[in-house]
């Protein structure tokens, strides 16, 4: 029930690249990529936060370096501006089904992010990073409070822990703890996508065939592919545990 955006990236540069697997709702991805239908046109589908720990139970668990969940929405500030909101993990400890503790989040995934201020802590609520482009546009500074209305039209606020320079789309967002965003948006336990950083073997013809249709492989080919750390086989195994 999920779909993947996978890339064959050089493993020693994983920290520079960040994620090389992105897990999204299959139907949402197909509608957007094939038919050009936006989220506003169709009922939105979500993944379940409760499935995140299962990713570290696949055959290639030791190759999963880090992962981050993401939930996106919008909030309207008290000055009338509508701005993008994203919830994620920053430095989060997750207890795996095995009983082990796995530390992960954006501090592990986005080593190139520059923060003027401090990273929000996952065990605190209502702290946020504000992207530098958005901060410049709205004259937001670290230490400020952003006041807005939530889904129930109740006034809430986010404390600006730092200003983020990412060099990407995050420079135009407010990014807060996943649990905070879920509460604001009324989407407890839900996420839009998962980004995964995995150590992989370069793709070859077998891996490319398998990524299109694993059922096209012979039994021997399937075993070789499944038991090799191709990005496509790791993604396939994630698909087996994430619904």
Pin down the residues of each PLM region.
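Soluble non-cytosolic domains of exported or imported proteins
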Residues: 45-46, 129, 228-229
